[in-house]
Amino acid sequence: MAINKDVEIVGFDLGHGETAVALALLSATVEPQILDVYGTRSILTAVAQHPTRGVLIGDDAVMARNVSNLRIAFKSPDLERLDVHEPLTLFVRKVVDILLQDRKITGGDTTLFFVGCPSGWSEIVRLRYAELLRHGGMTQVTVLPESRAALVYARDSGYISQDLAEGAILIVDIGSSTTDFTAVQHLEIRLSDFGQNALGGGLLDKAILERTVMTHPRQAELQQIFAEYPVYAAICELECRKVKEMYFSNPDMWRETPASRSVRLETSPPLYVDIAITPQGMNELLMTPLLQLQGRSWYTTFREALAHAKNRMGEEQPQLVLLTGGASRMAFTADLCAEVFTEARIVRGAEPEFAIARGLASAGRVELKTIAFREEVELLLTSGKLRQTVEERLPALMSGVASFLAQGLADHTVLPAFRDWQTGRIRTLAELEQTIQPRAVAWLESAEGRQALAQVVTVWFAGLLPSVEKLTDPICDTYRIPHASLSVPPFLNMTHVAPVPGGMVDMGSMTFLGALGNVVTLLGSVIIAKILGGGGTALLMHGPLGFLIGLVIGLVTLSLGKGIMIDWLKGVELPTMARGLISESRVKTALVEQRSEFEQKIREALMNNLPAFDDLLDSSAESITSALHKAADKAVLLIR
């Protein structure tokens, strides 16, 4: 999927109390911008119908006269209810129309909407919600959990620093209707479906209104007006919200004079509703039992929710608690977080009321880029280029192995066997000839042999990885992520490459080369398995190794005099004095002199049997492919 520079990503945070809209371009990485609607960046989630002006939203819906059916607080999972889906559709359609008319968005195929929902909403509710949003004018819409948006916002805004990225983080999103908790570990959501679906700042709005009505001098009349004209009740509740926000913007400011507003209801005669909050009054409200919270207070319920989150996180307690959502501006929420999470840093996001909208736009952009990124990675992995890269480097590996065998077999197999013959532990040259093969097998299978071969494979593998990275670097550049994020990790699952002789791979000694030893030790074991070919030196016995054995026997024969029949001499048990006629240093010198020829014969034997290594090629490519798949899973967390 190619990145279309013209695609607009709209993050639409339809809140219970307020709504915010953010815009991001698919081709960019900058922070999404908050779009204003009718000059305001935070839109009151309210909708009404006017006899001449049609559908009104936000403050316009509240302030206009002669409106009918003023609806507020209509975000709910109960989408089948008329008082939920009707105002929701009207509100969304109006916001989209305004954005189109003001040319804030283009619309059509180039505008993609990403709308948030509480993490606790079921998949069925989300599908129904998306359907309603499409009816509201969002032709291309995706519903994302707000927990995902909160995580992306926290990452992109810099609240999750590099030193915190590996630790646990708790994001607390306090909205008007719900409080959602998102536990993050290694930049991935670990827990997101816990919180308080009924605990939101809107409950305090209702509590303030209820107390205002109960203390009003014309209480009965006011209750009757609200019953007959719900629009007035909605207006007063919204004013209660504004007074609450006024109070929490600076609680100390209202110690002597209460935060207050007055509402004039256009009744005959007019009725005034005075809404006032003092520190004492707010403290009483916070501790008042609420029916919506099963008789518990807002303060107590929030603290219990924090304690529940702490318990759910278990041993992985957060290093950072990030507060988002407009209701997080209530300072006591951060104080309670500090009481419960004593070891964590407590941070309230800048402009918390816009966090989810920005997070939705960023998450949408990341999701689309991630799809394109995975498609490009998959295209590379299925192209055969990885296998071709390994195949091109195989001759270099065979040369390294040939050099290793030429020296190793001479030093660790032939010379020790010669010493044993010279001292009489091996009776005849025929026995010496017969013992070379099992000694070669034993040395190649030993820890010493494997470790020596691993040094060779290390050099080869180190030369292979840059060739692989040349294939992946262009993809990293396209998506602006570090090259190292899409590279082969130090461990590959190579055990399935070929049958490895039992006991050959000692998992306890696989760290002798550091992390890379995990790969090269297994690769070395596979190479040894191929060389031994069913327990014998199948690739070497008849050619290279036979050449080396013949060299030693020939030296012994020459030391005893010309004309001696080699076949006869092989079966003779020579006296110790005769065996001493040829020194170990002479044999060692001859082996060194013939090493290049021996190495060439081994290289030819290996290269002539390259088809035997086909499954090594295939499985090496498959293992690198699997490793890159895993790297891609982590790399997507870096896409912005």
Labelled PLM ranges:
Residues 2, 88-106, 147-160, 285-318, ...:
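Phosphate/ATP-binding catalytic cores across multiple sugar-kinase/actin-like superfamilies
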Residues 2-32, 158-191, 360:
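Gly/Thr-rich phosphate-binding beta-strand-loop-beta motif of the actin/hexokinase/Hsp70
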Residues 129-159, 163-168, 204-205:
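Hydrophobic, small-residue-rich alpha-helical packing segments that form membrane-like cores
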Residues 114-125, 315-337, 353, 490-495, ...:
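Glycine-rich phosphate-binding loops at beta-strand->alpha-helix junctions
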Residues 27-136, 207-208, 214-257:
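Phosphate-binding loop and its immediate beta->loop->alpha context
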Residues 61-65, 203-335, 388-477, 481-484, ...:
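Gly/charged contiguous loops adjacent to phosphate- or pyrophosphate-bearing nucleotide/cofactor binding elements
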Residues 46, 146-158, 205-207, 347-384:
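Glycine-rich phosphate-binding/hydrolytic loop that grips phosphoryl groups
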Residues 16, 219-226, 230-231, 358-526, ...:
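Acidic, glycine/GT-rich loop-and beta-edge segments that sit at the periphery of enzyme/chaperone cores
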